[in-house]
Amino acid sequence: MNNQKKIKCPICGKQNTWRPDNQFRPFCSERCKLIDLGEWASESRKIPGSSIDPESIVTTNNKQDNVDEQ
């Protein structure tokens, strides 16, 4: 009995089998994996939400900052 899960590649829609040895999963190939990465890098894909004002970000003082000041 074949219980392997079939999935569609999120980029091209090609049907493939979900296998632990598929280094590109959930994609069908390195090409589709790189296309997806490029879409995230170019901000064609993004997680919805409101933008953060850079002025409102609070930074913490870490040990490296103290070393540089001495």
UniProtKB/Swiss-Prot annotation:
Note the superkingdom of the native organism: Bacteria
Q: Where is the stretch described as Disordered?
A: 43-70
Q: What is the lineage of its organism?
A: Bacteria, Pseudomonadati, Pseudomonadota, Gammaproteobacteria, Legionellales
Protein name as it appears in the record = DNA gyrase inhibitor YacG
Q: What does this protein do?
A: Inhibits all the catalytic activities of DNA gyrase by preventing its interaction with DNA. Acts by binding directly to the C-terminal domain of GyrB, which probably disrupts DNA binding by the gyrase.
Task: Report which gene this protein is encoded by.
Answer: yacG
How many cofactor units bind, and how? Binds 1 zinc ion.
Give the matching Pfam families.
YacG (PF03884)
Any one Gene Ontology MF annotation carried by this entry is: DNA topoisomerase type II (double strand cut, ATP-hydrolyzing) inhibitor activity
NCBIfam families in the cross-refs: PRK00418.1
Q: Which PANTHER family match?
A: DNA GYRASE INHIBITOR YACG
Which cofactors, by name?
Zn(2+)
> Which chain regions cross the lipid bilayer?
none
Positions bound to Zn(2+): 9, 12, 28, 32
Task: Check the record and name the Gene3D superfamilies matching this protein.
Answer: Erythroid Transcription Factor GATA-1, subunit A
Q: Cystine bridges: which residues?
A: none
Keyword annotations of the record: Metal-binding, Zinc
Gene Ontology annotations of biological process type = regulation of DNA-templated transcription
Q: Which organism is it from?
A: Legionella pneumophila (strain Corby)
Report the InterPro entries cross-referenced here.
DNA_gyrase_inhibitor_YacG, Znf_NHR/GATA
